Swiss-Prot record:
Residues 266-284 have a biased composition (Basic and acidic residues). Probable rhomboid-type serine protease that catalyzes intramembrane proteolysis. This is Rhomboid-like protein 19. One of its GO terms (cellular component) is Golgi apparatus. The gene is RBL19. Belongs to the peptidase S54 family. It comes from Arabidopsis thaliana. The chain crosses the membrane at residues 23-43, 58-78, 93-113, 120-140, 158-175, 179-198. Keywords: Membrane, Transmembrane, Transmembrane helix.
Length: 304
């Protein structure tokens, strides 16, 4: 029998439980066999012969605090996102974002070495699931942007931005910020990049989310958006300049009326799915305490 206080800590998906187990096992392996770190973590100087660590580096944590935080965050965010995206797309998102994040970290570390000639950038071990977690925050921003987060009283669309601001601010007071800050920044950007341009939409057979509400400038305050938009437009044209016109042809009819697969319609449909999934989760968690209460009352009557 589940108690009311524990209902919110149940109903995690099987996929998220499996991924959480991978994180825990990965942490135990590097703790009991430290010699495996150079083979699993991303160490830029050794990445060329050990190219697989562009993948493995994201699936284990070097610290106990890291594995606890990553496991708990994965379970709760996956509990919401996986039903909306589907298990296959959720797993694909994690794999692609993790790989692209550590690929960018590798390139950045090599560039910093050639600029500064400091070997610390070549031999610093990069590892952890926090890049993917940053990307998952972007997924929450996309699906329920205007939903207020309980206790925090802030809208979900600002979660990635607040996380980055706090991480950058804390980097001035910590010595190991280089080990996590690039991963968080690239994880956030790669999560947005994947959802913006790559994620397949089964309803429309198109890819990505080109709606204005999910533009890159929405990560910034409105005061800065006139400056950010022209810069973002350059990268947008580089990524999908030719396909943009094709997408518009599919999204709009000749009369200018939006079709079912248009940007605004798809964005609204995605938010409705997210809100419905959130309501179902909350409804399930409320149903369990109510059911337990009815069972207790029934047991009491039987005893009488």
């Amino acid at each position: 029998m589940s108690s009311p206080g524990t209902s919110m800590f149940t109903n995690f998906t099987k996929l998220c439980k499996g991924l959480a187990l991978v994180l825990v096992v990965g942490h135990l392996v590097v703790q009991f066999i430290p010699a495996t770190v150079p083979y699993l973590a991303l160490i830029p100087a050794r990445t060329i012969p050990f190219a697989w660590n562009l993948i493995t580096s994201g699936y284990f944590e070097l610290s106990v605090y890291g594995v606890v935080f990553s496991t708990v965050s994965l379970l709760f965010m996956g509990k919401f996102l996986e039903p909306v995206w589907g298990s296959t797309e959720f797993l694909k998102f994690i794999f692609v974002v993790n790989f692209l994040t550590y690929l960018c970290v590798f390139v950045t570390a090599i560039a910093l070495y050639y600029i500064t000639r400091l070997e610390v950038y070549l031999y610093m071990p990069f590892a952890g699931f926090h890049g993917v977690l940053a990307g998952l925050l972007v997924g929450i921003k996309q699906i329920i942007p205007d939903q207020e987060i309980l206790l925090l009283k802030i809208k979900a669309k600002w979660l990635p931005s607040i996380m980055l601001i706090l991480s950058i601010a804390s980097s001035f007071f910590t010595l190991d910020s280089a080990a996590y800050l690039p991963t968080l920044i690239f994880g956030t950007y790669m999560g947005w990049l994947y959802l913006r341009y790559l994620q397949r939409r089964p309803e429309t057979k198109l890819r990505g989310d080109p709606s204005d509400d999910f533009a890159f400038s929405t990560f910034f305050p409105e005061l800065l958006r006139p400056v950010i938009d022209p810069i973002a437009l350059i990268f947008h044209r580089m990524l999908c300049g030719r396909s943009n016109a094709t997408s518009e042809d599919h999204d709009y009819s000749t009369s200018g009326a939006p079709l079912p697969g248009s940007d605004s319609a798809e964005a609204s449909r995605r938010r409705e799915r997210g809100a419905r999934a959130l309501e179902e989760r909350l409804g399930t968690e409320r149903l369990v305490p109510a059911r337990n209460k009815d069972e207790l009352q029934s047991d009491g009557l039987d005893n009488v």
